């Protein structure tokens, strides 16, 4: 595994895989308490879709030296990056901003190398993953869980089966197809494990957003079932931006310092909301407040991190777990990992090496697999597959499938049910939603927006764009924006970063209200895994005409990866799916690498109502 991680690190350092942006200008806008705030104008090549998340580290490279910096804010429409540095930067010509993806890989490799110095305890559940014996389950004795949890599963036996197995066995795989209540079931499992005397549980997710979403469900349960929950039982490691969680007293110690920091965060957020309402969120004053807010969140994290070794349940991202000494060296009885279909074996070893009783892995192996640049099997195969679990092998004794789909309209479930889940999903969402009745595509759950005059062009970075498709998407958004009474969410999904960049550029030029902007999310399929929207607009991009050369489907649609992509894109929709594509191109499916399963999905979509625009 060490060699595989070395190869991954080398691939990540390759300039072709790094995110590097030239800087046309950089100005210092503020100096506060030994911290400098800068405003950099980036040169973003056509088709690039830069991502800069608040608080994330990056390298600002000048001719003189590299500087470690942190993101304060990013103005996507104008490609302006606001950032902080503890050092005064001597700006030179030919500066660059570099996103360094190797930090987590290096930390993971170092941790695994430390592990090689001693043997993992053979009584720990992780050992079974290493020797390939996860089918040999061990019974875990435990006291009764709170009786109120029984009512959570009155209507769903598959959820109760997963709940019981998670408590009774040392290893549990919970297979949760879209909309079957993974988070709902997990929240109950977490409550039950918390009730076990003396046991400590680590809960890990891929992203901060996912951590906050799951913790919010647990907090909601606690508010109803155990309103007198004392402090020091649950802790959210890392930095949260969720205001509800920041207001939840039992997640924080009862001391003057943390109370003061939380109050400051609340005040900063209130001020920033005022700037945003006035459309001045990128003013120098707002950026200074945002920098203070970032520092306050970091201060709160550092002040409260000691709780990791004291609380019963810790929530964290996977990357934070690997890097944070208190987490990676901590002793836990139980480990829960959400979205485990994107978890490879090296990450599991890092998370589970000190877990003594239970490993509970939750995810859908029919969705996206681990992200890797090097493409080495041990890094790209998820833990389900490495344990012999896939759609053709679902009889593993530790596997507990969730079968009742309650999120999406039955007609949407029909599209993915047979191809991806063998027809085992049962729909339990008969409620008619008014979104279906409204235009565009009134009374249609699935609509096909036919774009026959499109043309695929390749950007400098090799990604794809289709301007006609993007205009069709914007026309659909314009229609939804016209109805001011609507409050539902809209997701725009596309496989290519080049098309995301184009769509975001067009979206930023529209004079949509702040409320409508907040309700629309535009991104690649990967950015949507684990999320959902009332309406999904799926822009397929590929069509029968290329700017140069013979048309062919992009490799992202190929083979198993293409199947997973289609499954995720379609299953994000709760009530309505609109596919923007060239229907004739779907019928021919050129390229030779499109699987029969993907073609069957195309044929199902082609049966939907469509109109030319």
Please annotate each region the language model reported.
Residues 271-313:
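Conserved P-loop NTPase mechanochemical-coupling segment
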Residues 71, 127, 131-252, 295-298, ...:
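ASCE P-loop NTPase helicase motor core
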Residues 59-63, 317, 539:
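Residue-level recognition of conserved beta-strand edge/terminus positions
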Residues 59, 70, 82, 173, ...:
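Beta-strand cores of modular interaction/reader domains in eukaryotic scaffold and signaling proteins
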Residues 196, 319-613:
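Conserved helicase motor core of SF1/SF2 NTP-dependent helicases
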Residues 36-38, 54-56, 65-67, 77-79, ...:
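Core residues of folded domains in eukaryotic genome-function proteins
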Residues 23-161, 231, 242-274, 578, ...:
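Pre-ATPase regulatory/linker segments immediately N-terminal to the P-loop/RecA-like helicase/translocase core
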Residues 1-63, 467, 471, 477, ...:
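Accessory interdomain/linker segments of ATP-dependent helicases and helicase-like nucleic-acid enzymes
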């Amino acid at each position: 595994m060490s060699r595989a991680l070395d190869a991954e690190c080398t691939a990540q350092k390759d300039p072709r895989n790094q995110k590097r942006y030239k800087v046309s200008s950089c100005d210092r806008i503020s100096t506060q308490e030994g911290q400098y705030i800068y405003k950099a104008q980036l040169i973003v090549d056509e088709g690039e879709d830069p991502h800069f998340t608040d608080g994330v580290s990056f390298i600002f490279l000048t001719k003189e030296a590299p500087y470690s910096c942190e993101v304060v804010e990013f103005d996507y429409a104008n490609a302006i990056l606001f950032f902080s540095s503890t050092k005064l930067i001597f700006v030179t010509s030919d500066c660059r901003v570099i996103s360094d993806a190797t930090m987590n890989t290096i930390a993971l490799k170092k941790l695994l190398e430390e592990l090689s110095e001693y043997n993992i305890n053979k009584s720990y559940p992780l050992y079974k993953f290493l020797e390939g014996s996860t089918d040999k389950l061990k019974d875990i004795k435990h006291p009764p869980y709170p009786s109120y949890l029984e009512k959570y599963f009155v209507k769903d036996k598959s959820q109760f089966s997963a709940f019981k197995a998670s408590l009774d066995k040392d290893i549990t795989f919970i297979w949760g197809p879209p909309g079957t209540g993974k988070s709902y079931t997990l929240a109950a499992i977490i409550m039950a494990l918390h009730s076990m005397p003396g046991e400590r549980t680590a809960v890990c997710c891929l992203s901060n957003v996912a951590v906050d979403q799951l913790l919010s469900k647990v907090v909601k349960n606690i508010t109803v079932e155990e309103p007198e929950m004392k402090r020091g039982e649950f802790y959210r490691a890392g930095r949260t931006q969720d205001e509800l969680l920041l207001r939840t007293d039992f997640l924080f110690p009862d001391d003057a310092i943390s109370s003061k920091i939380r109050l400051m965060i609340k005040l900063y957020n209130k001020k920033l909301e005022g700037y945003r309402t006035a459309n001045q969120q990128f003013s120098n004053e707002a950026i200074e407040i945002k920098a203070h807010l970032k520092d306050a969140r970091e201060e709160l994290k550092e002040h409260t991190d000691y709780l990791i070794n004291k609380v019963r349940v810790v929530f964290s991202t996977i990357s934070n777990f690997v890097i944070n000494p208190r987490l990676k060296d901590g002793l836990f009885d139980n480990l829960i990992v959400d979205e485990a279909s994107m978890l490879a074996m090296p990450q599991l070893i890092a998370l589970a090496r000190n877990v003594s009783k239970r490993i509970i892995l939750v995810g859908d192996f029919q969705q996206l697999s681990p992200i890797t640049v090097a493409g080495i099997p041990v890094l790209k195969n998820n833990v389900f597959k490495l344990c012999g679990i896939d759609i053709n092998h679902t009889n593993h004794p530790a596997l507990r499938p969730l079968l009742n789909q309650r999120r999406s309209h039955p007609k949407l479930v029909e599209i993915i049910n047979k191809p991806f889940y063998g027809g085992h999903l049962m729909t339990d969402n008969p409620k008619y939603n008014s979104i279906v009745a409204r235009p565009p595509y009134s009374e249609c759950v699935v609509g096909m927006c036919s774009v026959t005059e499109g043309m695929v062009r390749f950007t400098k970075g090799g990604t794809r764009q289709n301007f006609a498709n993007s205009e069709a998407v914007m026309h659909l958004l314009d229609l939804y924006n016209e109805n001011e009474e609507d409050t539902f969410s809209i997701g725009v999904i596309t496989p290519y970063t080049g098309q995301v960049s184009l769509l975001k550029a067009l979206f930023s030029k529209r004079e949509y209200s702040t409320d409508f902007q907040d309700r629309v999310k535009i991104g690649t399929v990967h950015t949507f895994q684990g999320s959902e929207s009332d309406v999904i607009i799926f822009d397929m991009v590929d069509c029968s005409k290329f700017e140069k050369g013979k048309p062919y489907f992009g490799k992202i649609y190929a083979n198993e990866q293409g199947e997973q992509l289609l499954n995720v894109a379609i299953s994000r929709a709760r009530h309505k799916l609109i596919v923007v594509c060239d229907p004739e191109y779907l019928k021919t499916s050129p390229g030779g690498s499109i699987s029969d399963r993907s073609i069957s999905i195309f044929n199902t979509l082609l049966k939907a109502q469509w109109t030319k625009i």
